[in-house]
Amino acid sequence: KMGMMYQCFCTRSEIKAEIMRAGNAPHEEDYSVYPGTCRRLSVEERKTKIDQNLSYAWRLNIRAASKKLGNLIWNDIRLGQYTVPVGIIGDVVLARKDIPTSYHLSATLDDHIQKIGLVTRGEDLVTATHIHKILQMLLGLKSPTYLHHPLIMDTKGVRLSKRTRAQTVKSLKASGLKREDVIDLLGKKNILSLLSLIN
């Protein structure tokens, strides 16, 4: 009804090739910014692709959202105010042919249904929060309060994560480290920063 979504038939390799062709080589954090190829398809072109049974994803038309919303302004308890031009976000995937909702849409609706009042996540997910705030505004949903905490780094400054098979706090304690040692390793500055917000 709102004209905020469209079908995208591009594969990941086609998207990457289009970004490279346009001379906008993606940085690691920018890789998800879609160049809008299928946004420009005519109704007939879209119908032809559907008739060919091509797989597609549903994308948010961020240009249409930008016209409706303008700038996104929101506050994080720790990081302060963000003012983001909606148009820079990119046409994010909201659903796929085989998966009815994306992480972004699911998280936004789940927070609303469960009446979540505070969302706490790593500061590496601020961009995801921009997307969730946009979806909340478009869907007329009440927004929770957000707190983006500092990331925990190892001694080399690399973020601890499952993806890099970093040691867990449980495994550090099992190796004989005391609570104080683990806190030192995680960074007192980060821990104290979070504790000051809680108190």
Where are the model-predicted features located?
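A generic structural-conservation signal
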Residues: C8-F9, T145, D181, L195
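Active-site cores that bind ATP or allylic diphosphates and position pyrophosphate for catalysis
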Residues: M2, Q7, S13-L160, T168-K173
